[in-house]
């Protein structure tokens, strides 16, 4: 049961999970063989009235790991030149140390148990983060749940009937510049705002805290 005194906390709202928005840009679709080239991480906070907001942010350009396959079509899509010195790229290890440090601080501050990735088509971002974690031997320090995610594509499909990030943002009243898409930082910012909008709308509509009276018995089985 939810403690009615503490319902307006991240801990209560997400069953002890600490939601963290992640967006990655890569050199292909295979997390094992393609490079993680850019990652943005955004933590969230809940105010005293239970409304979800963006909190802290980290953004890194990443050096491709040795032997990574760099697919030209992927690089054309995200407009990344892996060899450009202007990227000021860091290693996967350097980026993950800072990301995990920020997330661990947030977990402790919010009295949560574990972080959970929030992403648009979350299985993709989750797979690349986990692969990088294995490559850098950071598994023990990894604060994220090994398989559970919050997918804003699925949530937007439920709420708006739209699964594309730009379309979901449009329906949510969030300005989305398609010319800035496929930047990890830009997409993470929009995903974070979208997730907050969805969570806050559900609360505003009376869905949180949950009341069994909102549905009738076996409502999903009615023909």
Swiss-Prot record:
Class of enzymatic activity (EC top level): hydrolase
InterPro entries: Exonuclease_RNaseT/DNA_pol3 (IPR013520), RNase_T (IPR005987), RNaseH-like_sf (IPR012337), RNaseH_sf (IPR036397)
GO molecular function: 3'-5' exonuclease activity; magnesium ion binding; nucleic acid binding; RNA exonuclease activity, producing 5'-phosphomonoesters
GO biological process per UniProt: DNA replication proofreading; tRNA processing
GO CC list: cytosol
Record domain Exonuclease: where: 20-195
One Pfam family from the record: RNase_T
Residues reported in the UniProt entry to bind Mg(2+) 2: 23, 25, 182, 187
UniProt entry keywords in alphabetical sequence: Exonuclease, Hydrolase, Magnesium, Metal-binding, Nuclease, tRNA processing
E.C. designation(s): 3.1.13.-
Free-text cofactor note: Binds two Mg(2+) per subunit. The active form of the enzyme binds two Mg(2+) ions in its active site. The first Mg(2+) forms only one salt bridge with the protein.
SUPFAM superfamilies in the record: Ribonuclease H-like (SSF53098)
Gene3D superfamilies per the UniProt record, alphabetical: Ribonuclease H-like superfamily/Ribonuclease H
Binding site for Mg(2+) 1: 23
Active site as annotated: 182
Functional description taken from the UniProt entry: Trims short 3' overhangs of a variety of RNA species, leaving a one or two nucleotide 3' overhang. Responsible for the end-turnover of tRNA: specifically removes the terminal AMP residue from uncharged tRNA (tRNA-C-C-A). Also appears to be involved in tRNA biosynthesis.
Subunit structure: Homodimer.
Family to which this protein belongs: Belongs to the RNase T family.
The protein's name: Ribonuclease T
Organism of this sequence: Blochmanniella floridana
Underlying gene: rnt
